[in-house]
Each structure stands twice: as structure tokens, then as C-alpha cells.
């Protein structure tokens, strides 16, 4: 999968990310990856479910879900563990 078919989830409203995913599929992407970490994980799940069940129903399916942990440095020099998720949506043939 090409790196340009990735939507990174942040603090914006969910519908902004839904529109970004739908735009990727409308431009011909076979797969779109939704990535998030920390508190944005629930928003990433919401985006995937809204795209799959409301906008592109019977057109898009979940290919795989990857979860993990990243070690991020803090301001005082220590490291903290942050959860990550990647949801890969694929267009049905």
C-alpha cells in the first residue's frame, strides 16, 4: 500500500477524517489506512465504522487491524508508553 493512502487521526471532528477517507477511495485507492495513537484511538474506530456502515456500505470492508505501543520521550527526559492502532480499509471487488 502506498504511503499517501494514510489518514492520521488527531483532534479535529470525526467527519473531517471520514471525508478524507472517502476522498481517498473516490480517487481510486484500493486500500486506505487509518492511524491513531493515544486518546485518538476511539476517534479512529468511529471513523472506520462511519465510513463502513453509513457512507460506503457494501463497498468497503476492514482488511486488518494492528495494535501496538510506542515509547515516546517526555519533556523531563523519561519515556512513556502510548498505544497505537492502524485500521486498514479495503474496497470490495
From Swiss-Prot:
MF GO annotations: double-stranded DNA binding; RNA binding
Residues modified as N6-acetyllysine: 11
Pfam families referenced in this protein's UniProt entry, alphabetically: Alba
PTM summary: Acetylated. Acetylation at Lys-11 decreases DNA-binding affinity.
InterPro entries per UniProt: Alba-like_dom_sf, DNA/RNA-bd_Alba, DNA/RNA-bd_Alba-like
Major location (coarse): cytoplasm
Record's keyword annotation contains Acetylation: yes
Keywords assigned: Acetylation, Chromosome, Cytoplasm, DNA condensation, DNA-binding
Location within or outside the cell: Cytoplasm; Chromosome
Cellular component, GO annotation: chromosome; cytoplasm
One GO term of the biological process aspect: chromosome condensation
Keyword flag Nucleotide-binding: no
Family statement: Belongs to the histone-like Alba family.
Functional description taken from the UniProt entry: Binds double-stranded DNA tightly but without sequence specificity. Involved in DNA compaction.
Alphabetical list of HAMAP family matching this protein: AlbA (MF_01122)
The protein, known as: DNA/RNA-binding protein Alba
Organism (species): Pyrococcus furiosus (strain ATCC 43587 / DSM 3638 / JCM 8422 / Vc1)
Amino acid at each position: 500500500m502506498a504511503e499517501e493512502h494514510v489518514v492520521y487521526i488527531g483532534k479535529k471532528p470525526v467527519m473531517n477524517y471520514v471525508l478524507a477517507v472517502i476522498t481517498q477511495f473516490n480517487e481510486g485507492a484500493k486500500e486506505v489506512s487509518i492511524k491513531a495513537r493515544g486518546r485518538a484511538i476511539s476517534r479512529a474506530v468511529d471513523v472506520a465504522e462511519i465510513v463502513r456502515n453509513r457512507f460506503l456500505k457494501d463497498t468497503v470492508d476492514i482488511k486488518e487491524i494492528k495494535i501496538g505501543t510506542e515509547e515516546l520521550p517526555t519533556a523531563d527526559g523519561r519515556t512513556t508508553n502510548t498505544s497505537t492502532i492502524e485500521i486498514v480499509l479495503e474496497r470490495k471487488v
